[in-house]
Amino acid sequence: VMNSPATHIARDASNSSALQLLARLGFAVNGLLHILIGSIAITVAIGAGSGSADQSGALAQLASSPGGVFLLWTVVVGMFALGLWLVVSAFVMQDEPKRKWARRLANIAKAIVYIALGVTALTFARGGTSSSAGSTQSASSSLLSSPGGVIVLFLAGVAVLGVGGYFTYKGAAQKFRSDLAVPGGSAGRAVIALGVVGYVAKGIALAVAAILVGVAAVTNDASKSTGLDGALKALAALPFGTSALILIGVGLMAYGLYCFIRARRARL
């Protein structure tokens, strides 16, 4: 019910300048993480590094940098705030019922991803470590050893493939333009170019990760499911894989730059 007390509270929260400012911080730190993931992917591709080309690798790189603890706590606050803003805004959006519920579910799914990333960042900020690839393998192993787990894992792969497809479509069709106020002239063209390249690259990376999850399910081998890091390194092992990984690394960095621009110009 749109006029319920809970809806009024949610609307007031979503319009809160403090929460909106923190959500913009969330977009910015998400951009920083993608720039780091992209740079790690490129160093792995050219054989100059061996870090994890995923969120854990990016957080580990932050942890080892000057002022790393402060940066990690900034990531924690930004990710939690962005997750909270997505949940709150899900309940005040206006649209026709079917589309509204689809958008609500999408917002809540994204919120879960950001909050989970915030929890991982919190682990690093408190001096711990975490491995996205290891967590993915562990979760896959648990599923494969449970009744019906193969089907659940395969469906998880299909879901991730769907997300990858959505990112690719959103980039290629420039559907992201409604998310932010695109400036005019050459600056606007640059923002659109970053969005197209960034979303398509992220979509391809997620699609490769999804295929590995599917392979793990079909072969009943959890070691095949290694998340984004494993997906990018598997890509590097293919013919022309080094070039492909460099291009995806550049694309992920483009997505990171787009996130920085979105932090400034997002429609909240």
Range-by-range predicted roles:
Residues 2-80, 263:
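An N-terminus-focused feature that recognizes amino-terminal "leader" regions
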Residues 17-18, 36, 40, 67-173:
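Hydrophobic, ordered structural segments
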Residues 17-34, 101-114, 193-204:
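Alpha-helical transmembrane segments and their helix-start/interface "positive-inside/aromatic belt" motifs
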Residues 46-57, 128-138, 177-180, 220-229:
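Peri-membrane helix termini and adjoining interfacial loops of integral membrane proteins
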Residues 56-62, 138-143, 222-243:
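Short, membrane-exposed interhelical loops at transmembrane-helix boundaries
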Residues 118-134, 203-221:
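Alpha-helical transmembrane segments and their membrane-interface junctions
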Residues 152-163, 232-268:
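Alpha-helical transmembrane segments and their immediate juxtamembrane interface regions
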Residues 176-192:
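Juxtamembrane inter-helical linkers in multi-pass membrane proteins
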